[in-house]
């Protein structure tokens, strides 16, 4: 996280300065990060090798349902082959869709999931768009805007 949180009973980390400490306490890494210059390639061999080996499998697991640009495919496959990574569940890739010949399809310790969002209810979407239009007409700012400088 960019911003420190205080949650009872939970160790919280923030910023690049605490990334290695976070990784050292993490045996299952779940990435739901947006695609930004800061997150490009963050799931790489260095990151994998900093993860805890204290979990139930003796090697870490990664789950990426964020963006494909975050992961370095060759590093993940090499770490799996070397036993440095117990498994990977991947929902996103570069390129998408994942090519039929990719080793991710056949690697015994990789689970590939379809990158699909939930079904959208047209009535709910229309009501939300109408709400945003009403805000705009009233001189209020739109809600839930993307911060283009941050990329999410």
Segments (PLM) and residue ranges:
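Rossmann-like adenosine-cofactor binding region
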Residues: 4-102
């Amino acid at each position: 996280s960019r911003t420190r949180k205080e949650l009872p009973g939970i160790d919280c980390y923030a910023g690049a300065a605490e990334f290695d400490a976070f990784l050292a306490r993490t045996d299952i890494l779940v990435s739901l990060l947006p695609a930004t210059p800061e997150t490009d390639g963050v799931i790489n061999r260095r990151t994998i090798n900093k993860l805890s080996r204290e979990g139930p499998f003796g090697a870490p697991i990664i789950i990426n349902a964020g963006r494909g640009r975050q992961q370095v495919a060759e590093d993940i496959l090499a770490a799996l082959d070397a036993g440095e990574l117990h498994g990977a569940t991947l929902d996103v890739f570069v390129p998408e869709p994942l090519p039929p010949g990719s080793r991710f399809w056949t690697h015994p310790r990789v689970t590939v999931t379809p990158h699909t969002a939930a079904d959208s209810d047209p009535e709910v979407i229309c009501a939300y768009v109408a709400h945003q239009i009403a805000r705009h007409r009233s001189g209020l700012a739109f809600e839930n805007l993307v911060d283009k400088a941050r990329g999410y």
